[in-house]
């Protein structure tokens, strides 16, 4: 798919909140702008709660503190039980700038297993909100930079199955109650530009790692058109061509076989065309990929 799993699950394009790339004020403004009209805002963390580029700088915990939202932990309970008590206690008390309101356990073997985990929650002072059982029908293999979801994967059926499981074992109503906060973000409306540039962005199964806000900024600078290095035969006329990251290495035969697109890109670059390429997009511009 050309969309992320978070987009598919929500039915709405997600946005990145990144305190390394953006200022604290901009992070708050993004949250306010995109979240104001929503019934529920879910901030999906990355790696561990406190993992950042320098200590907890840039971490999910820092973002939670910046925008003032509570934290629900998702904790792997595989091959453990009461030992989660000190782990939970540490999460709750390690940093006073965030508020841990509950936990959902993953990889729970049985109802009896969950009972041990609930006792640990009581003693650690963290509310147990439910669990996800061990179930092969809701497993997605992981790979570098995310989950392994290809064009053969039926996400709608998978999401329905996950919802069915969660409805039975997670107290969603209580989770939403604990996470209800006053929405206090201020929207600035962003920067308004009236540029007349034409910007072509590569977007298909091979190239789809891009920040939504970057695309919106390009739209304010001019007209944005999308094209597919996999399927299109020619490059759109453009003042700038943007090749975002993705997984071109998974589509090498198709990309290599699209001679018309390859030659069009080469000619554009060699005649002084402006190009922005990131990660997989930069790989595509190389002579070879090994």
Task: Write out the residue ranges for each language-model feature.
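Conserved nucleotide-sensing/catalytic segment adjacent to the nucleotide-binding pocket
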Residues: 13-29
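Helical hairpin unit composed of two closely spaced alpha helices linked by a short loop
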Residues: 234, 238-241, 278, 284
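Cysteine-nucleophile active-site neighborhood
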Residues: 248-290
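Inter-motif core of Ras-like GTPase G domains
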Residues: 55-78
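Short, small-residue-biased leader/transition segments that mark boundaries at the very start
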Residues: 2-5
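Internal gly/pro-rich beta-alpha loop/helix module
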Residues: 82-191
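Glycine-rich phosphate/diphosphate-binding loop of Rossmann-like nucleotide-binding domains
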Residues: 197-233
């Amino acid at each position: 798919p050309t969309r992320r799993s978070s987009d598919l699950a929500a039915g709405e394009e997600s946005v990145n909140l990144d305190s390394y790339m953006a200022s604290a004020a901009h992070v708050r403004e993004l949250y306010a702008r995109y979240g104001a009209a929503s019934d529920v805002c879910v901030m999906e963390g990355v790696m561990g709660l406190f993992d950042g580029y320098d200590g907890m700088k840039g971490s999910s915990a820092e973002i939670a503190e910046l925008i003032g939202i509570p934290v629900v932990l998702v904790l792997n309970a595989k091959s453990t039980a009461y030992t989660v008590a000190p782990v939970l206690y540490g999460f709750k008390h390690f940093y006073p700038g965030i508020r841990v309101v509950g936990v959902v356990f993953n990889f729970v073997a049985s109802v009896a297993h969950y009972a041990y985990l609930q006792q640990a929650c009581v003693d650690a002072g963290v509310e147990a909100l439910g669990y996800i059982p061990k179930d092969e029908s809701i497993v997605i293999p992981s790979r570098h930079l995310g989950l392994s979801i290809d064009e053969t994967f039926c996400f709608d059926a998978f999401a329905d199955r996950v919802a069915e499981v969660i409805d039975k074992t997670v107290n969603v109503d209580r989770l939403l109650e604990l996470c209800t906060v006053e929405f206090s973000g201020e929207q600035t409306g962003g920067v308004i530009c009236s540029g007349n540039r034409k910007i072509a962005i590569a977007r298909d199964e091979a190239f789809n790692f891009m920040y939504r806000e970057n695309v919106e900024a390009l739209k304010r600078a001019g007209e944005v058109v999308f094209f597919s290095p996999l399927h299109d035969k020619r490059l759109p006329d453009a003042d700038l061509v943007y090749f975002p990251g993705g997984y071109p290495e998974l589509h090498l035969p198709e990309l290599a076989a699209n001679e018309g697109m390859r030659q069009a890109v080469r000619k554009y670059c060699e005649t002084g065309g402006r190009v922005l390429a990131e990660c997989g997009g930069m790989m595509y511009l190389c002579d070879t990929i090994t």
